[in-house]
């Protein structure tokens, strides 16, 4: 098992990140995680109700409707057009017919909460979803991702106390092994000046191969034509469910590159890159590599320096890479040549090292760890047990198969796969390894506790959480990019569609920390901006 022979992560990234990296790329990212939910005391489980009850178990007071859905429009396509309908619209209509007979309103079922740390926690119809606040550094993002695990698990514990037993279990994974997949989406703020065609060309090969370092591992294959096929281990939990190169859909016809155009920011300046191909990681190191390497690739695209790799059939390729744990499967390029997923990653690393080395400490940490990980995957992947999820899970399963003398098609292995992702510390296999010191943590308990309490102080996520803590009764509505307050003759709004400069965020937060009311804070903030203009 690999030892931590290099500089600790916490030292390597303890710096003030600037607003922009070279060539206008802003560091701002976040993760949305849909959790699998089960309840073992019922023969038939209504996941809509269970997800709603779980989210509401987080509350210590009655639910108040605050989230404003007016700005959410999944039909806008980043390729420059608006689709008239999505494949998932029909399913949503069917859900609406069923929901009409439930004893809850739409807003009660969604139970949409904005938490004191700036995160969003809500019922995404059949799954509880936790969205981190916007983060500027990997250190903050890892802490907030782990904070999400603890927050949803504490909600489950409260729910179980009400039920009289440990009946509700939550899983940070991406499949129920019955053909249903749920997502872990990574999001990045990108300048709209970068053409979407450039993002498409530069990202597709990278995303096809990213599972080599960021896959969560999966026992079995879920193919639409044959259902669940046991006995085969693969790198990614999501690969089986990818159906097209690009699409605005997310639930059906799932794309490698999602084209939904909901920037949650000033539309004239920014776009939000919404990636749905990623697995839900338990290993903090894998999460750091997943987000960190993607951020570097976006910088390469901004510089027009991404490797020129065009795959013949990306959807086929993502499955081929996933279903070969030896990393030797080749995929076809449009030039007729073949390439492995590992080789694709090596080409992206080489380009990033050439163009980005020395940019800042976090970039150098990502480059160093990216290189080391690719080398270990080539030489001795066993050194990555406790660092990468797919390697760690495979090691656990191999150990179990050997000790219990099982065949690889034994259904017990799929159950172990599931329990690897259980966020209950008393049952989760990964959390058991963590408690035994067998995985490398990049956060401390103090980091996670702090992230549960408040958001990053240099992003609007932290400002959002501050408003929730200071003025909960005066918030009329919220979206990612704005907060509307009540209490005056007319509602007043804090616009955050272009509030990304750390110094501006901190100045705005200072106004809200000291003001007696939101109106006073907005007045002080606006006066401060005018005096500087």
Put a short name on every predicted segment.
Residues 2-166, 170-171, 204-216, 246-257, ...:
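Terminal catalytic/cofactor-binding subdomain
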Residues 157, 166-244:
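Internal, well-ordered domain-core segments that constitute the primary functional module
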